[in-house]
């Protein structure tokens, strides 16, 4: 049973997440030859103040 963890910054719509999990599930089932029902996806959303790149918080880079 494949279990995928996806970490995203907050701000995606439910529709975008639906499309993402559908496409990721299709990619996994096609690659690993397993049924859709076996695929699990966990989406974790981060606040901008909890993510940094090059020493700068995302909240400070608008």
Predicted regions and their residues:
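A domain-level signal for the structural core that forms small-molecule/cofactor-binding pockets
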Residues: 2-62
């Amino acid at each position: 049973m494949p279990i995928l963890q996806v970490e995203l910054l907050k701000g995606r719509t439910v529709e975008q997440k639906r499309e993402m999990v559908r496409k990721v599930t299709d990619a996994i089932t096609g690659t690993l030859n397993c049924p859709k029902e076996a695929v699990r996806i966990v989406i974790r959303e981060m606040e901008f103040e909890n993510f940094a790149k090059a020493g700068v918080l995302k909240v400070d880079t608008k």
